[in-house]
Amino acid sequence: MAKAATIKIKLLSTADTGFFYVTKKNSRTMTDKMSKRKYDPVVKKHVEFKETKIK
């Protein structure tokens, strides 16, 4: 069997609230760390979310 191309990642808020989103990415085409600007309901603002490992 082949290795799966998509992996699950955790997008953690840079506002240090502990809020995170879980999403998936294609590890073959996106080799660098993902970062997205999304809504953090704890601070009620759009902030940068950076990729971390799921433990």
UniProtKB/Swiss-Prot annotation:
A GO CC term attached to the entry: cytosolic large ribosomal subunit
HAMAP family xrefs: Ribosomal_bL33
MF terms in GO: structural constituent of ribosome
Entry's family note: Belongs to the bacterial ribosomal protein bL33 family.
The protein's name in its UniProt record: Large ribosomal subunit protein bL33
Keyword set, alphabetical order: Ribonucleoprotein, Ribosomal protein
Keyword Ribosomal protein: yes
Keyword Transport set for record: no
Pfam families: Ribosomal_L33 (PF00471)
Gene Ontology BP, a term: translation
